[in-house]
Amino acid sequence: MTYWRSIFLVLLGACSYGVLSIFMKHAFQLGFTPFEMSGSQLIFGGLIMTAMAIFFSKQRFSFKYLLLLAPASLMMASTSLFYHQAVSRVSASLAIVLLFQFTWIGVLLEAIVDRKWPTAEKWVSLAMLGAGTVLASGLSESGIQSVDMVGLIFGLMSGATFALVIFFSGRILPGMDPYLRSAISISMAALMLSIVYPPTFLVNGQLLQGLLPLGLLVAIFGSVIPIFCLAVGVPRIGNGLATILSAVELPTVVLLSNFVLQETVSLPQWGGVFMILAAICVPQVKWRKLFSPSHALEQERM
């Protein structure tokens, strides 16, 4: 039961990150900048998780955790920074395709570290994810025209750093209390981002102009829920599978765009959504067992 609960939590975290796009789009329409929103996401997320850790964590804080979790926090802050830079330079559809390179990067990273070649199921799943991502993003219809190379590089870097976020979630202190771990990781990521982009929105009156409620929403759906779910789920199911499951983020974005934002979703995009969902299920099917003679005999007896 713990295994399937962990799968559910990773899926929930990825879906939550997909919901983030709804609030981000509304925030940009109101005139808030990507840096104000990413800063709000991490700063408010860190405060919320710190409060939760104070009340619910069963593990005591130690300064050594700051050093051990620093790589995860750095990748978290980098993903936010790189992705927003990519969105500002290339189309949204291309940016999300570039971000979704985390799927094969994550599986490859696990294979290199563990010195274990990915299973056939994972290769099939990755191929389906690649095709489904291009279709669901709408890139197959709009095409790529005069791509900004700087934006392209930032997009690929966001995919690489997000793969490392998932990787570190399963490798660094896997048995650590998830409340304390999430609080430290998000808070340090907020501090790192603030060094590059000082959070002037905290003192320039933007919070009272509508940024506060939006900042809290992006913090909950973009930091608190996904990071906590990854902290709980990834150590129990492994990095490779968690990376593939996290691809459910894109179908969530497409579904919300259609039903909440009332945006038109084409037939190829729907096909991409179903292909991604099918790809997520592939690693869970025991194909060799399913087609083995013993399994067929078992089915006949039933």
Question: Locations of the language-model features?
Answer:
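C-terminal-most transmembrane helix of multi-pass membrane proteins
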Residues: 42, 138, 211, 247-302
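Hydrophobic transmembrane alpha-helices of multi-pass small-molecule transport proteins
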Residues: 49, 70, 121-140, 193, ...
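C-terminal transmembrane-helix exit sites in multi-pass transporters
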Residues: 48, 53-57, 83, 102-127, ...
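Hydrophobic/aromatic residues within transmembrane alpha-helices
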Residues: 27, 37, 41, 86, ...
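Hydrophobic alpha-helical transmembrane segments of multi-pass integral membrane proteins
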Residues: 4-9, 35-52, 121-131, 150-157, ...
